[in-house]
Regions:
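Secretory targeting signatures
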Residues: 1-24
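Immediate post-signal peptide segment of exported/extracytoplasmic ligand-binding proteins
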Residues: 25-34
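Extracytoplasmic "Venus flytrap"
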Residues: 34-62, 69-79, 98-101
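Periplasmic-binding protein-like
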Residues: 37-38, 91-99, 116-120
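Hydrophobic alpha-helical
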Residues: 97-111
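Flexible loop/hinge segments that line or gate small-molecule binding clefts
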Residues: 110-136
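Hydrophobic alpha-helical segments within soluble ligand-binding/sensing domains
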Residues: 134-146
């Protein structure tokens, strides 16, 4: 009977170590993402504050697997240098949260096909040139009608 208990304990230990090893390998393979945000305002403007809340939620959910770089109070028409700054910092994704940023962001996206760019509320993703790394998005826009 002692032999059965010993064999059972050894099997449990081996399985535990194997499980831990698989978990460690899986965690090491997870990609660390760097996301850049450009906002037209700051936390005192409701429009920008909603994006800040979304960014904070993403940081909370993904923890140390995501790094966020944020630039506030960028006027439309002055976004190009800030986009370049985020590219130079090595951002994998860049979210420029103002409708007026659209044309400038698309021009930069054309130069950097390995970086994903998104302009919430934008409308030019499907106009020429259509780029695989440039996106527009809307939230649940119907809610504004009520």
């Amino acid at each position: 009977m002692k032999r059965v208990y010993t064999l059972c304990i050894i099997t449990c230990l081996v399985m535990s170590l194997f499980s831990f090893g698989i978990h460690k390998i899986t965690r090491e393979d997870e990609k660390h993402l760097k996301v850049g945000f450009i906002f037209v305002g700051d936390e005192i403007t409701p429009y920008t504050n909603n994006f800040i809340k979304a960014r904070d939620h993403v940081k909370e959910v993904y923890g140390d697997r995501i790094e966020c770089v944020t630039i506030y109070n960028v006027a439309e028409g002055q976004v190009e240098s800030h986009l370049q700054e985020l590219v130079d910092e090595g951002c994998d994704y860049i979210i420029a949260a103002s409708y007026g940023y659209g044309p400038d962001v698309k021009a930069i996206a054309e130069q950097y096909p390995d970086i994903q760019f998104c302009v919430p509320t934008g409308d030019n993703a499907n106009s020429d040139p259509v780029l695989p790394n440039y996106h527009n998005c809307f939230g649940e826009i119907y809610q504004g009608r009520y």
